[in-house]
Amino acid sequence: MDGYWAKKVLHVGDAKCVPCWNGGGTVKVIVLSDEKGVPSEETLQAVRDYIEENRPVGAKVTVVGATPIPVTIEVSIVMATGFGFSEAKESIGQYIREYLDNIAFQDNTPLSYYKIGERIFSAPGVQDIDTYTINGEKLSISAEVGEFFQLQEVIINETL
């Protein structure tokens, strides 16, 4: 369900509504910031105020911030000639963040193990991938409604 009213508030990137989350007449609005992260308390209060002014009579609305799922990527790569370690690490991090931003708050869209591999392999400075994990596993990760993936760290090991 779309968080139409919440999206009208400054610094809101996306929002989801969960009807009847706590019984009849209740609605939970889950907010993602415009930077694809946890919104500030000021933003959440602005959403509450805006919805309170516009909501239907009788609806009890709860506004909360989205919940991050921390993501750590560890990868062993063969670096391309002419690239430094820090360049490769930065480009891999950027490519992964772009992917996570694209899937943030999309219903039924897991963090795909194979799409992370594509992003790593496509990053400037990477000639080949030896192995990689997401949070220590070689598996895709699912998110529940109101959750989003947040990159914590990219750990790179160079393979010769």
Named regions from a protein language model:
Residues 1-109, 160:
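Carbohydrate-recognition loop of C-type lectin domains
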Residues 88-160:
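An aromatic-glycine-centered, glycine-rich loop/turn in mixed alpha/beta architecture
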